[in-house]
């Protein structure tokens, strides 16, 4: 499968060191705080918060950290920041479109760190709308294949808003509108199919195929951007073939 799933897998393998792990913890904690502020601090009445807490637990974030973030967000405890979501747009090496999603309490710091990472790694900032039109936010749910067939998964989620089920290596990926992810998770639970992961992200309509050396430049840019604590996600329209992925993972 081209695009997201394959290079996300590669990226996750690259991220398995302590520094990356610490930053991932910080991002998960921030998401819990924002979810609690937006929809209330009761996970049973706030599906987004419930999902963020589950993701944090799965990533082994300590329960105390999770609970403090929930309380800060809900106002039960002082110290919550005024988080804002900001999108930045630009181009990486080889004209690859880059969409950068930040969650920050300091717009000036976020803009400065994103601009510096882009300029030092062959990227250029772009005006709002210059690349975002190429991307669409999609919901996704991942399930482990195990003994399942694509038809098994499709039959379970067809009436829940699923738009597509595709092969993603050792998993099946279900795509939908972002608002249908919860219904799809519920449908899978009813069919006794375990969910590995779910979220929403941005997918590009038009992809740029890259060779391994050019892909490495984009990964360096992504790594530099993700050094900023304000950067939550980086999306690109690069496309990596199985051969290129194998070379990157070698």
UniProtKB/Swiss-Prot annotation:
Tell me the superkingdom of the source: Bacteria
Q: Recite the UniProt keywords alphabetically.
A: Cytoplasm, DNA-binding, Transcription, Transcription regulation
- Which molecular-function annotations from GO does this UniProt entry contain? DNA binding
Q: Which residues form a coiled coil?
A: none
Q: Which Pfam family would be a valid example here? A: TACO1_YebC_N
Q: Where is this region: Disordered?
A: 1-22
* One cellular-component annotation, GO: cytosol
- InterPro entries in the cross-refs: Integrase-like_N, TACO1_YebC-like_2nd/3rd_dom, TACO1_YebC_N, Transcrip_reg_TACO1-like, Transcrip_reg_TACO1-like_dom3, YebC-like
Q: Name one GO biological process term.
A: regulation of DNA-templated transcription
Where is this gene product found? Cytoplasm
Cite the PANTHER family for this sequence: TRANSCRIPTIONAL REGULATORY PROTEIN YEBC-RELATED, TRANSLATIONAL ACTIVATOR OF CYTOCHROME C OXIDASE 1
What is the similarity comment for this entry? Belongs to the TACO1 family.
NCBIfam families associated with the record: PRK00110.1 (NF001030), PRK12378.1 (NF009044), YebC/PmpR family DNA-binding transcriptional regulator (TIGR01033)
Q: Per its record, how is this protein called by name?
A: Probable transcriptional regulatory protein DIP1378
């Amino acid at each position: 499968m081209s695009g997201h799933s394959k290079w996300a897998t590669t990226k996750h393998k690259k991220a398995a060191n302590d520094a990356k792990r610490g930053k991932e913890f910080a991002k998960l904690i921030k998401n819990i705080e924002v979810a609690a502020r937006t929809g209330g601090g009761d996970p049973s009445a706030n599906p987004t918060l419930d999902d963020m807490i589950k993701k944090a637990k799965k990533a082994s974030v300590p329960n105390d950290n999770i609970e403090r973030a929930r309380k800060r967000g809900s106002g039960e405890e002082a110290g919550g920041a005024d988080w804002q979501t900001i999108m930045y747009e630009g181009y990486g090496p080889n004209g690859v479109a880059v969409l950068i999603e930040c969650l920050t309490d300091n717009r000036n710091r976020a803009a400065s760190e994103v601009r510096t990472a882009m300029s030092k790694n062959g990227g250029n900032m772009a005006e709002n709308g210059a690349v975002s039109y190429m991307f669409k936010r999609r919901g996704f749910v991942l399930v482990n294949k195990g003994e399942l067939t694509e038809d098994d998964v499709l039959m379970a989620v067809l009436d829940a808003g699923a738009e597509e089920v595709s092969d993603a290596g050792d998993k099946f990926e279900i795509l939908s509108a972002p608002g249908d992810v919860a219904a799809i998770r519920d449908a899978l639970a009813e069919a006794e199919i375990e969910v590995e992961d779910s979220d929403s992200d941005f997918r590009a309509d038009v992809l740029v195929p890259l060779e391994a050396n050019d892909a490495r430049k984009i990964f360096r840019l992504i790594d530099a951007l993700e050094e900023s604590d304000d950067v939550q996600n980086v999306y690109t329209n690069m496309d990596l073939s199985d051969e290129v992925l194998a070379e990157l993972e070698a």
